[in-house]
Protein backbone atom coordinates (compact mmCIF):
# COMPACT_ATOMS: atom_id res chain seq x y z
CA UNK A 1 0.00 0.00 0.00
CA UNK A 2 1.56 3.27 -1.12
CA UNK A 3 -0.71 5.38 1.06
CA UNK A 4 -2.04 7.24 -1.96
CA UNK A 5 -5.74 7.94 -2.19
CA UNK A 6 -7.60 9.54 -5.05
CA UNK A 7 -10.70 11.69 -4.86
CA UNK A 8 -12.24 9.51 -7.56
CA UNK A 9 -11.36 5.93 -8.49
CA UNK A 10 -11.37 7.00 -12.15
CA UNK A 11 -9.11 10.04 -11.65
CA UNK A 12 -11.32 12.08 -14.01
CA UNK A 13 -15.00 12.68 -14.72
CA UNK A 14 -17.56 9.87 -14.66
CA UNK A 15 -19.52 9.26 -17.86
CA UNK A 16 -23.22 9.65 -17.22
CA UNK A 17 -25.98 7.85 -19.07
CA UNK A 18 -27.45 9.61 -22.11
CA UNK A 19 -30.47 7.29 -22.36
CA UNK A 20 -34.00 7.74 -21.05
CA UNK A 21 -34.87 4.06 -20.63
CA UNK A 22 -38.57 3.48 -20.17
CA UNK A 23 -37.83 1.25 -17.16
CA UNK A 24 -35.05 3.27 -15.48
CA UNK A 25 -35.32 2.93 -11.71
CA UNK A 26 -33.36 6.13 -11.14
CA UNK A 27 -35.95 8.15 -13.04
CA UNK A 28 -38.63 6.61 -10.80
CA UNK A 29 -37.00 7.62 -7.51
CA UNK A 30 -38.81 10.10 -5.29
CA UNK A 31 -37.44 13.63 -4.97
CA UNK A 32 -35.43 14.72 -1.97
CA UNK A 33 -32.89 11.88 -1.82
CA UNK A 34 -29.14 12.49 -1.76
CA UNK A 35 -27.70 13.66 -5.09
CA UNK A 36 -25.48 10.61 -5.65
CA UNK A 37 -28.56 8.38 -5.89
CA UNK A 38 -29.75 10.28 -8.97
CA UNK A 39 -26.50 9.88 -10.91
CA UNK A 40 -26.93 7.48 -13.84
CA UNK A 41 -23.54 6.07 -14.73
CA UNK A 42 -22.84 4.46 -18.09
CA UNK A 43 -19.07 4.21 -17.84
CA UNK A 44 -17.11 1.29 -19.30
CA UNK A 45 -14.39 1.80 -16.71
CA UNK A 46 -16.89 1.20 -13.91
CA UNK A 47 -18.10 -1.91 -15.71
CA UNK A 48 -14.59 -3.33 -15.52
CA UNK A 49 -13.69 -1.99 -12.06
CA UNK A 50 -16.97 -2.43 -10.19
CA UNK A 51 -19.14 -4.74 -12.29
CA UNK A 52 -21.63 -2.08 -13.37
CA UNK A 53 -23.77 -2.79 -16.42
CA UNK A 54 -23.55 -0.35 -19.32
CA UNK A 55 -25.59 0.13 -22.49
CA UNK A 56 -22.57 0.89 -24.75
CA UNK A 57 -24.39 3.97 -26.10
CA UNK A 58 -21.76 6.29 -24.59
CA UNK A 59 -18.87 4.39 -26.14
CA UNK A 60 -17.13 5.99 -29.07
CA UNK A 61 -14.70 4.06 -31.28
CA UNK A 62 -11.74 5.26 -29.21
CA UNK A 63 -13.40 3.94 -26.04
CA UNK A 64 -13.99 0.54 -27.64
CA UNK A 65 -10.41 0.47 -28.89
CA UNK A 66 -9.12 1.25 -25.38
CA UNK A 67 -11.09 -1.67 -23.91
CA UNK A 68 -9.66 -3.93 -26.62
CA UNK A 69 -6.09 -2.60 -26.39
CA UNK A 70 -5.88 -3.06 -22.62
CA UNK A 71 -8.10 -6.16 -22.66
CA UNK A 72 -10.39 -4.74 -19.97
CA UNK A 73 -12.46 -7.79 -19.30
CA UNK A 74 -15.14 -8.69 -18.44
CA UNK A 75 -17.48 -5.96 -19.57
CA UNK A 76 -21.11 -6.06 -18.43
CA UNK A 77 -23.64 -4.98 -21.03
CA UNK A 78 -27.27 -3.92 -20.62
CA UNK A 79 -28.67 -5.27 -23.88
CA UNK A 80 -32.46 -5.45 -23.29
CA UNK A 81 -33.04 -6.44 -26.93
CA UNK A 82 -30.97 -7.03 -30.05
CA UNK A 83 -33.72 -5.65 -32.28
CA UNK A 84 -32.22 -2.27 -33.32
CA UNK A 85 -35.53 -0.42 -33.67
CA UNK A 86 -36.93 -1.76 -30.42
CA UNK A 87 -33.71 -1.00 -28.53
CA UNK A 88 -33.80 2.61 -29.75
CA UNK A 89 -37.41 2.82 -28.55
CA UNK A 90 -36.75 1.21 -25.15
CA UNK A 91 -33.69 3.36 -24.42
CA UNK A 92 -35.22 6.50 -26.00
CA UNK A 93 -31.96 6.91 -27.90
CA UNK A 94 -31.87 6.88 -31.70
CA UNK A 95 -28.23 5.72 -31.60
CA UNK A 96 -28.84 2.63 -29.44
CA UNK A 97 -29.45 0.17 -32.28
CA UNK A 98 -25.84 -0.82 -32.97
CA UNK A 99 -25.33 -3.00 -29.89
CA UNK A 100 -24.59 -6.18 -31.87
CA UNK A 101 -21.84 -4.43 -33.84
CA UNK A 102 -20.14 -3.32 -30.63
CA UNK A 103 -20.55 -6.73 -28.99
CA UNK A 104 -19.08 -8.26 -32.15
CA UNK A 105 -15.98 -6.09 -31.87
CA UNK A 106 -15.48 -7.19 -28.28
CA UNK A 107 -16.05 -10.81 -29.26
CA UNK A 108 -13.45 -10.67 -32.04
CA UNK A 109 -10.94 -9.25 -29.56
CA UNK A 110 -11.60 -11.98 -27.00
CA UNK A 111 -13.19 -9.65 -24.44
CA UNK A 112 -15.29 -11.56 -21.92
CA UNK A 113 -18.84 -10.22 -21.57
CA UNK A 114 -21.92 -10.62 -19.41
CA UNK A 115 -25.29 -9.32 -20.55
CA UNK A 116 -28.66 -8.49 -19.10
CA UNK A 117 -32.18 -7.91 -20.30
CA UNK A 118 -34.75 -5.96 -18.30
CA UNK A 119 -37.86 -7.79 -19.44
CA UNK A 120 -40.83 -5.54 -20.22
CA UNK A 121 -44.09 -7.39 -20.86
CA UNK A 122 -45.38 -6.87 -24.37
CA UNK A 123 -42.15 -5.26 -25.61
CA UNK A 124 -39.03 -7.41 -25.42
CA UNK A 125 -40.58 -10.69 -24.27
CA UNK A 126 -41.73 -13.76 -26.22
CA UNK A 127 -40.37 -13.69 -29.81
CA UNK A 128 -38.19 -10.66 -29.09
CA UNK A 129 -36.59 -12.42 -26.12
CA UNK A 130 -36.04 -15.55 -28.22
CA UNK A 131 -34.32 -13.40 -30.85
CA UNK A 132 -32.11 -11.71 -28.25
CA UNK A 133 -31.10 -15.04 -26.69
CA UNK A 134 -30.31 -16.47 -30.12
CA UNK A 135 -28.32 -13.40 -31.19
CA UNK A 136 -26.27 -13.29 -27.99
CA UNK A 137 -25.69 -17.05 -28.11
CA UNK A 138 -23.60 -16.50 -31.23
CA UNK A 139 -21.00 -14.78 -29.06
CA UNK A 140 -20.39 -17.77 -26.78
CA UNK A 141 -17.82 -18.50 -25.28
CA UNK A 142 -16.94 -14.82 -24.75
CA UNK A 143 -20.54 -13.98 -23.87
CA UNK A 144 -20.46 -15.75 -20.53
CA UNK A 145 -23.93 -15.02 -19.18
CA UNK A 146 -27.32 -13.51 -19.85
CA UNK A 147 -29.46 -12.37 -16.93
CA UNK A 148 -33.14 -11.77 -17.57
CA UNK A 149 -34.62 -9.47 -14.94
CA UNK A 150 -38.33 -8.62 -14.81
CA UNK A 151 -39.03 -4.90 -14.87
CA UNK A 152 -39.91 -3.48 -11.50
CA UNK A 153 -41.23 -0.20 -10.25
CA UNK A 154 -39.46 1.53 -7.38
Whereabouts are the PLM-identified features?
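Conserved Radical SAM active-site core
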Residues: 2-143, 150-154
Amino acid sequence: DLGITFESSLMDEYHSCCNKCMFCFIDQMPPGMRDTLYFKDDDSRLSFLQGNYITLTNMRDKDIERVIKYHLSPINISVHTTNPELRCKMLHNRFAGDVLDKIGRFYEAGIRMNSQVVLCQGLNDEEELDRTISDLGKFIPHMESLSVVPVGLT
